[in-house]
Amino acid sequence: MKKILALIAAGVFLAGCVSNAPKSAVDAPESGKYSFAELQDGIRPMSLKGSVVESDACKNGNGAMCENFADSMYSKRDYASAANAYNAACVGSHIFPSCMKLASMFEKGEGVEQNKFNAIDLYRITCYYGYKNACKEMRRLGYNG
């Protein structure tokens, strides 16, 4: 009897988890211009424009402090340093607002080589983790995933 109750409780718990899961980029409408394969073909390694100031916070994996450093560098118009720090906060610590900012920088070519495919990919990944604005931006740029 205890096993049956435990199984029912686990089933109810898992059903609740599934219904609250974030919507993924896979659920995006198929109205865009680019397929996933086309997107992956267009992604290029990050090429920074100018010299980079690095932060100890970013080197040590402190995502929140790294994002603060990136915001500071961005406000000083040191876009290469900001892009490098946003990348560290996004990739290393999963600070998704940093991913959004880096995607925007790829879109505009601020501190990095302008690359719409890199921007779409960052928006797509951030959308997968439940950031609705990222989903909207990804669709605006033409991703049909």
What are these model-predicted stretches?
Residues 1-17:
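Sec-dependent bacterial lipoprotein signal peptides
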Residues 66-75, 85, 101-108, 140-144:
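Hydrophobic face of amphipathic alpha-helices that form TPR/SEL1-like repeat modules
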